[in-house]
């Protein structure tokens, strides 16, 4: 019955704020909505954000490690390349020296062969010259004997 009397009484005209059950009801609604949003939205979104941040930090750490490894490998390969170039350069120098030595040796052999052939030719020519002189001397002696014989016979 008291409820009925209150319902019939109407709303009293108050001042700036009316102190009735609306304000605490709104406060309870705000608190319930906060808990509900926290449970249904903010926690899952926060978890996703934290997972994403963890993934990003892990990915960045892995990328830094891989970058450091790549830089080490690059330095090692550069050192190996430098060593290989030096080795190739020394092989080239050795080959050039060997070719130069072989060239000089072949040139010396060719000069020796040419000198030997020249000396043999000179000896052969000298022998032929001496042979020709001997033949000529023999013919000269024969001709001179023939001339003397003819002169004396005449």
Curated annotation (Swiss-Prot):
Keyword Transmembrane helix set for record? yes
Q: List the InterPro entries hit by this protein, alphabetically.
A: ATP_synth_b, ATP_synth_B-like_membr_sf, ATP_synth_b/b'su_bac/chlpt, ATP_synthase_B_chain
The primary location reported for this protein is membrane
Q: Which residues form a coiled coil?
A: none
Regions crossing the membrane: 22-42
State where the protein is found.
Answer: Cellular thylakoid membrane
This entry carries the following GO cellular component terms, namely: plasma membrane-derived thylakoid membrane; proton-transporting ATP synthase complex
Q: How does it sit in the membrane?
A: Single-pass membrane protein
- Single annotated GO MF: proton-transporting ATP synthase activity, rotational mechanism
Ordered alphabetically, the record's keywords are: ATP synthesis, CF(0), Hydrogen ion transport, Ion transport, Membrane, Thylakoid, Transmembrane, Transmembrane helix, Transport
The record's section on Pfam families has: ATP-synt_B (PF00430)
The protein's matches in HAMAP family, at most eight in alphabetical order, are given as: ATP_synth_b_bprime (MF_01398), ATP_synth_bprime (MF_01399)
| Family named by the database record | Belongs to the ATPase B chain family.
Assembly description? F-type ATPases have 2 components, F(1) - the catalytic core - and F(0) - the membrane proton channel. F(1) has five subunits: alpha(3), beta(3), gamma(1), delta(1), epsilon(1). F(0) has four main subunits: a(1), b(1), b'(1) and c(10-14). The alpha and beta chains form an alternating ring which encloses part of the gamma chain. F(1) is attached to F(0) by a central stalk formed by the gamma and epsilon chains, while a peripheral stalk is formed by the delta, b and b' chains.
Quote the function comment for this protein. Answer: F(1)F(0) ATP synthase produces ATP from ADP in the presence of a proton or sodium gradient. F-type ATPases consist of two structural domains, F(1) containing the extramembraneous catalytic core and F(0) containing the membrane proton channel, linked together by a central stalk and a peripheral stalk. During catalysis, ATP synthesis in the catalytic domain of F(1) is coupled via a rotary mechanism of the central stalk subunits to proton translocation. Component of the F(0) channel, it forms part of the peripheral stalk, linking F(1) to F(0). The b'-subunit is a diverged and duplicated form of b found in plants and photosynthetic bacteria.
Protein name, per record: ATP synthase subunit b'
According to the entry, what is the taxonomic lineage of the organism?
Answer: Bacteria, Bacillati, Cyanobacteriota, Cyanophyceae, Synechococcales
Q: Which gene encodes it?
A: atpF2
